[in-house]
């Protein structure tokens, strides 16, 4: 141990540990200034008082943070726009879909697949379509939506025996989701008009 008057001095050959396990050896041959303080001690104090530099805009840390963006497929348009209020850029139509847009397009694809499904599918076609629906629920981009769909499929397995069975099964599944979201039911007797043949009034001709 050092004598009371010698606390803080490092003799030649003594070792001390720095953060990270690095070791540094202090030598006694440092020149002293007019007040008797070591130049090395003065330099250490000066460097300790220098504030740490914040990451610049072109630093890897800042660049990595700028790339992190919320999941558009997981939120609706209004929520997404609230996160973009500080941006001056105008909304473009060719941006990634938000949760509502993704849902609309996904249901359109599923209903159209059902509308053109074979009237009397083979056993292999029945199995393939049922498997497709289950795989769709596993890879759907909105995880909350996908989890909800998987739970519904466990309770209500896809009915792919015929085209009529499949279109009605999908329509009732869609209505279950609509009710959860507070949306009105769709008239399932009109699935062919909506997704294959067009409305009887000729408005789609």
UniProtKB/Swiss-Prot annotation:
Tissues and organs where the protein is expressed, per its UniProt entry: Ubiquitously expressed. Highest expression in the testis and liver and low expression in the muscle.
Cofactor(s) named in the record: FAD
Disulfide bonds: 142-145, 171-188
Region annotated Disordered, chain positions: 1-65
EC top class, as a word: oxidoreductase
Catalytic activity: 2 R'C(R)SH + O2 = R'C(R)S-S(R)CR' + H2O2
PTM sites of type Phosphoserine: 59
Segments of skewed composition (Basic and acidic residues): 32-44
Annotated EC: 1.8.3.2
Span of domain ERV/ALR sulfhydryl oxidase: 95-195
InterPro entries: ALR/ERV (IPR039799), ERV/ALR_sulphydryl_oxid_sf (IPR036774), ERV/ALR_sulphydryl_oxidase (IPR017905)
Keywords attached to this entry: Cataract, Cytoplasm, Deafness, Disease variant, Disulfide bond, FAD, Flavoprotein, Growth factor, Mitochondrion, Oxidoreductase, Phosphoprotein, Primary mitochondrial disease, Secreted
Any one of the GO CC terms: mitochondrion
Any one Gene Ontology BP term: liver development
Compositionally biased residues, Low complexity: 45-60
Gene Ontology molecular function: flavin adenine dinucleotide binding; flavin-dependent sulfhydryl oxidase activity; growth factor activity; protein-disulfide reductase activity
Protein name: FAD-linked sulfhydryl oxidase ALR
């Amino acid at each position: 141990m050092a004598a009371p008057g010698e606390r803080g001095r490092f003799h030649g050959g003594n070792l001390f540990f720095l953060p990270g396990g690095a070791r540094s050896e202090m030598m006694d041959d440092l020149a002293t200034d007019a007040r008797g303080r070591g130049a090395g001690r003065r330099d250490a104090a000066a460097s300790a008082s220098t504030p740490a530099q914040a990451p610049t805009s072109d630093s890897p840390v800042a660049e990595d943070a700028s790339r992190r963006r919320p999941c558009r497929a997981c939120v609706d348009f209004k929520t997404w726009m609230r996160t973009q209020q500080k941006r001056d850029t105008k909304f473009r139509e060719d941006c990634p879909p938000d949760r509502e847009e993704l849902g609309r397009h996904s249901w359109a694809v599923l209903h159209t697949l059902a509308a053109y499904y074979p009237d009397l599918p083979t056993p292999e076609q029945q199995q393939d379509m049922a498997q497709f629906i289950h795989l769709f629920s596993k890879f759907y981009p909105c995880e909350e939506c996908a989890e909800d769909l998987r739970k519904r499929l466990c309770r209500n397995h896809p009915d792919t025996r015929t085209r009529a069975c499949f279109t009605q099964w999908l329509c009732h599944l869609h209505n279950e989701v609509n009710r959860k979201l507070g949306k009105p039911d769709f008239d399932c007797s009109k699935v062919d008009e909506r997704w294959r043949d067009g409305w009887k009034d000729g408005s789609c001709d």
